[in-house]
């Protein structure tokens, strides 16, 4: 299968590795020194939890191909980058386009693709990996082979969608099919943003967070979940019902959060991303505020307190922006 991956950061790099590992002909879009590094040395990934290093040799281009034929194309970028690259994304000749990553402007993006006459299928997805891109390799944190949570923004995937991605990913990495991916993206934002507030509050070092601060973070996540439920969004992914309602699952989640915050996993999964992507986190929070505007009287005291303690987004971006 001919596969295109646009955006070779941590997430895009592992997705490209999974596609290469399954025997596909993979083309990646990587510019500048990073593109040169992949051409010269290969796509080198150190898998932190698995204690192994992989090297793949995808074909590297420095711009989104226009008119070249692919079976599947993955765009793995921030929501603002996806929108800025809309004209180039629309020009990709592929049976299926999958937009991967945090995105609270997904409906806008889908509408604009449709208005631009994009006739092929568009799915949205998220890959639960984290880490940091170094000068010559990627440090990747993942559990097991992981996979790609994926679905249309609204509705169910088609049989042809499932068959196509099943042919792309034939190893341990698999598509985790769901439905109505807008719900998935909203609940993910509700979980991630309080982690970001605490990370920035602690100087992008979760190890400095007190147990009480972590409790407040989990309470804020619960408020975000409750808001979305109030607005009629079913909990996503399925199985997370009751995770943040204050019961046994919540206490177990708090224990997991405490372990993550005290180890390198927290550094790679949360702190490094916050340190290198403050603009993305700001945009995600702005998007969630728009959702809050649909229920302006819904109380979120823990959320608001953490956001206030974190400080002004302009100051955060000025401190951590590159």
Regions found by a protein language model. Name each.
Residues 1-51:
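NAD(P)+-binding Rossmann beta1-loop-alpha1 motif at the extreme N-terminus of oxidoreductases
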Residues 3, 25-26, 97, 122, ...:
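Hydrophobic anchor at the start of a short beta-strand
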Residues 43-61, 192:
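N-terminal glycine-rich dinucleotide-binding loop that anchors FAD/FMN and/or NAD(P) in oxidoreductases
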Residues 53-139:
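Rossmann-like NAD(P)(H) cofactor-binding subdomain of soluble oxidoreductases
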Residues 139-149, 200-209, 264-275:
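Helix-loop-beta segment of a Rossmann-like dinucleotide-binding subdomain
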Residues 182-225:
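Active-site-proximal catalytic alpha-helix in oxidoreductases
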């Amino acid at each position: 299968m001919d596969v295109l991956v646009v955006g070779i950061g941590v997430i895009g790099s592992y997705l490209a590795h999974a596609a290469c590992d399954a025997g596909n002909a993979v083309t990646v879009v990587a510019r500048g020194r990073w593109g040169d590094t992949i051409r010269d040395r290969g796509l080198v990934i150190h898998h932190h939890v698995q204690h192994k290093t992989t090297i793949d040799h995808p074909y590297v281009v420095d711009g989104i191909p226009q008119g070249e034929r692919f079976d599947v194309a993955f765009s793995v970028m921030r929501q603002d980058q996806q929108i800025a690259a809309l004209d180039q994304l629309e020009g990709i000749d592929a049976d299926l386009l999958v937009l991967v990553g945090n995105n609270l402007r997904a409906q806008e993006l889908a509408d604009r693709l449709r208005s631009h006459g994009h006739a092929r299928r568009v799915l949205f997805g998220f890959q639960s990996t984290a880490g940091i891109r170094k000068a010559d390799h990627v440090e990747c944190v993942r559990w097991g082979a992981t996979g790609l949570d994926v679905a249309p923004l609204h509705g169910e995937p088609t049989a042809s969608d499932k068959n196509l991605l099943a042919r792309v990913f034939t190893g341990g990495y698999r598509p985790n099919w769901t439905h109505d991916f807008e719900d998935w993206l909203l609940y993910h934002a509700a979980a991630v943003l309080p982690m970001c507030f605490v990370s920035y509050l602690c100087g992008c070092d979760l190890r400095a967070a007190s147990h009480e601060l972590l409790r407040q973070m989990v309470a804020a996540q619960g408020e975000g979940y409750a808001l979305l439920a109030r607005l009629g969004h079913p909990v996503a992914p399925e199985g997370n019902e009751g995770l943040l309602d204050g019961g046994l699952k919540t206490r177990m989640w708090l224990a997991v959060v405490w372990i993550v915050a005290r180890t390198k996993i927290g550094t790679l999964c949360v702190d490094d991303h916050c340190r290198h992507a403050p603009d993305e986190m700001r945009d995600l929070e702005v998007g969630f505020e728009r959702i809050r505007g649909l229920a302006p009287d819904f109380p979120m005291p823990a959320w608001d307190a953490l956001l206030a303690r974190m400080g002004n987004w302009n100051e955060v971006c000025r401190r951590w922006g590159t």
